[in-house]
Amino acid sequence: MRRGRLLIAGLAALVLSACATLPEPVDDPKARYQEAVERLRAQTDWDASGRAALRTADDAGSLSLEWRQRGETYQVDLRAPLGAGSARLEGGPEGVWLTTSAGDREYAPDPETLVAWFTGYQVPVSALRYWLRGLDAPGPEVERLDLDPAGRPERLHQAGWEVVYRDWSQTNGLPLPRRLDISRGEDSVRVVIRDWSLAP
């Protein structure tokens, strides 16, 4: 009987010792989010292609987009359906140019002005570069950020806009949005990304 008690006590001590040395499982959505943010911000070269649906109180439209980001410079190709026209947006620290398929070429210090001129819609292009990847944009304060259990953004409020992430994909081991809704008042943009490509 005494030997049995000693054996049980020894096993219990062994189990407790093993439990004490095992690392705590990391299942913190905020930690996962911060890890993804660091990796995504370090990824300065990327491509994304998909579609955008634009809506106001009394109008709606859609276009396809091809976004090519290389450091601080970018090229975005916009195409309206049924041959209604296309444009290329080229931007960087010096400003932004927009060239249309009709041969028009316009310059502005920010992309929002040019996209509004071409499409007639308000689109937060400068912030979209970050929101597309599930990141907050530098500058304006983040008013709200909700994460899902996997540490991915569900809802982001920034610069007066609300970004709701509806679906996600995985590219090079990184979570990247597949579908997101962006809205401010009666203006809204739904973006669906078909393909992501990250530089190795």
Curated annotation (Swiss-Prot):
A lipid is attached at C19 (N-palmitoyl cysteine). Keywords: Cell outer membrane, Chaperone, Lipoprotein, Membrane, Palmitate, Protein transport, Signal, Transport. It is a lipid-anchor. Belongs to the LolB family. It holds the Pfam family LolB. InterPro entries: LolA/LolB/LppX, OM_lipoprot_LolB. This is Outer-membrane lipoprotein LolB. Plays a critical role in the incorporation of lipoproteins in the outer membrane after they are released by the LolA protein. Gene3D superfamilies: Lipoprotein localisation LolA/LolB/LppX (2.50.20.10). A lipid is attached at C19 (S-diacylglycerol cysteine). Its main location: membrane. Residues 1-18 form the signal peptide. One of its GO terms (cellular component) is cell outer membrane. HAMAP family: LolB (MF_00233). It comes from Alkalilimnicola ehrlichii (strain ATCC BAA-1101 / DSM 17681 / MLHE-1). It is found in: Cell outer membrane.
